[in-house]
Amino acid sequence: MRLVVCLVFLAPFALVCHGQVYKGGYTRPIPRPPPFVRPLPGGPIGPYNGCPVSCRGISFSQARSCCSRLGRCCHVGKGYSG
């Protein structure tokens, strides 16, 4: 009987305390900023995007990354599209 009385008394208190965590401004850990993007070979960096201005001299993986992230895709003999 005492256990039931204790649980009935403590349950609302626990819910109120648990709710205060969220009302008190608890936030997740702040994510780290992305590492500094170094210039890729083949030309200067385009503004704020991390992809070279020219398709020359970049690896296949770099070209694929620019294409999938930013829609700037290299085409043979044509350079970037998009």
From Swiss-Prot:
GO terms for biological process: defense response to bacterium; defense response to fungus; killing of cells of another organism. The modification Pyrrolidone carboxylic acid is found at Q20. The modification Serine amide is found at S81. Its main location: cytoplasm. Residues 1-19 form the signal peptide. One of its GO terms (molecular function) is chitin binding. One of its GO terms (cellular component) is cytoplasm. It comes from the Eukaryota. InterPro entries: Penaeidin. It is found in: Cytoplasmic granule. Pfam families: Penaeidin. Belongs to the penaeidin family. Antibacterial and antifungal activity. Presents chitin-binding activity. This is Penaeidin-3e. It comes from Penaeus vannamei (Whiteleg shrimp).
